[in-house]
């Protein structure tokens, strides 16, 4: 991730847009709105060649904005697109294998652990971060209560940074921040109305600046 602030920061999940140029423009515009730690780029339903094309357009503009570009699932695409990292939704074994192959050259994290036991197993392989929720799990205005609870428990005990998936309401970012986790991931909350994405990011950062708890040194 890029340099940490002393509060929870925003992670974006790139929107599901089939046209690579349109997707790149929307993400680039959004990143003008303010601080974003990283952008995760899912494959959605794209074939490997199309995903490669999308990634090659997105990665440089994400990096130019000062954020880390993380490719979901495909290490070959991550390497060819010169991404900063790889986001995986698998179990500890999947993450361990990827860490052995790609760290520290690439950031490697993810998990989607649904319970504490699975989360601790993932923690034992020392990913760069753990993710609670699904990349397309923003189906309600608020973050899923289970993910909030897991994030709060994790952040209180374990030093590995944590990302929790937020909801479709931009204000859900604050509820995530109040658990003490380092990062909140948003997708539809930012990109539901693409033209508003920059102003939504500015509003979320202002909200977190004003109300999010501060981390102790």
PLM segments and residue spans:
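C-terminal binding/interaction regions
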Residues: 183
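Short beta-strand and adjacent tight-turn residues that come in two discontinuous sequence segments
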Residues: 88, 132, 186
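Conserved N-terminal beta1-alpha1 strand-loop-helix module at the mouth
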Residues: 1-87, 92, 101-108, 113-128, ...
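Flexible, gly/pro- and Lys/Arg-enriched active-site loops
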Residues: 93-96, 134-157
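Gly/Ser/Thr-rich beta-alpha loop segments that engage phosphate groups in nucleotides
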Residues: 135, 168-169
């Amino acid at each position: 991730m890029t340099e940490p602030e002393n509060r929870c920061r925003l992670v974006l999940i790139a929107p599901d847009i089939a046209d690579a140029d349109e997707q790149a423009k929307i993400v680039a515009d959004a990143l003008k709105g303010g601080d974003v730690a990283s952008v995760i780029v899912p494959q959605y339903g794209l074939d490997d060649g199309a995903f490669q094309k999308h990634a090659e357009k997105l990665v440089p503009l994400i990096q130019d904005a000062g954020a880390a570009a993380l490719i979901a699932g495909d290490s070959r695409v991550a390497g060819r697109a010169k991404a900063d990292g790889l986001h995986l939704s698998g179990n500890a074994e999947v993450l361990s294998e990827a860490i052995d192959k790609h760290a520290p050259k690439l950031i490697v994290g993810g998990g989607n652990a649904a319970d504490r036991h699975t989360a601790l197993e993932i923690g034992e392989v020392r990913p760069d971060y753990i993710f609670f929720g699904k990349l397309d799990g923003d189906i309600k205005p608020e973050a899923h209560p289970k993910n909030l609870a897991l994030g709060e428990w994790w952040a209180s005990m374990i030093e590995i940074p944590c990302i929790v998936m937020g909801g479709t309401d931009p204000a859900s970012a604050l509820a995530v921040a109040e658990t003490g986790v380092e990062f909140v991931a948003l997708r539809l909350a930012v990109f539901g109305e693409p033209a508003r994405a920059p102003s939504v990011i500015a509003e979320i950062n202002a909200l977190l600046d004003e109300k999010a708890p501060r981390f102790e040194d």
